[in-house]
Amino acid sequence: MHLRIKICGVTRPEDAELAARLGADAIGLNFFSQSPRYLTEEKAVEVVHAIPPLVAPVGVFVDPTADQLNFWGTRLALRTFQLHSFDPTVLGPTFGAMCWSSILAQAVNEPDDLEKIRTLVREWRTSTREVPDPAVLVDARVAGKHGGTGQTVPWELLAGFDAGVPLILAGGLTAENVADAVRQVRPYAVDVAGGVESAPGIKDAEKLVRFIDAARSAAAGLP
């Protein structure tokens, strides 16, 4: 099984370089101002310039306006957008021309949340016909938080679940539990922020190595 790995909440160029060198497929850049991993324009430019070719920078946004997406997409040449708590009807035609791929976030804590994923995908397809189908990032629900909570999703709910689009598993993943998560859920990708950090936004080299090795090894043993 081929597993993609996204290292999210990167705030330093050296961490972007290290994650890419170790085999990360994508680097998440957080533009939610209330996040401890929030990037200013100056710092975001530095991080993006450190990401090598064929590794995707991903802009992470919470309830964004079309103007915000257009600004950051243009400023950083972003083509992949991760959207939390957003209204697809406000995205506008410029976003459709700019966006090559999108990731929609959905919290999952109970069985009824699986239907919310299907609804999210249907609404996206209806409202953004000019944009390709999204992936869905699944995270744990914690009141007032948009990711980075350290809480795990009930993996057993996602075992065998098919949303009709790629599934990205987030939520409390670490080097110690990612192998079990991959074997149970078999996601398209895994996403980690706090599980590979020494402090918010500061990636830990040893944790990165162990996480990526554990995730890749687990996926390699699956058909």
Question: For the regions a protein language model found, what residue spans apply to each?
Answer:
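Extreme N-terminal starter segment of soluble prokaryotic enzymes
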Residues: 2-5
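A C-terminal functional module that forms or caps the active site or interfaces directly
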Residues: 164-184, 197
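Conserved anion-binding
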Residues: 31-35, 43, 48-169
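C-terminal helical cap(s) of enzyme catalytic domains, especially alpha/beta-barrels
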Residues: 41-51, 93-95, 193-223
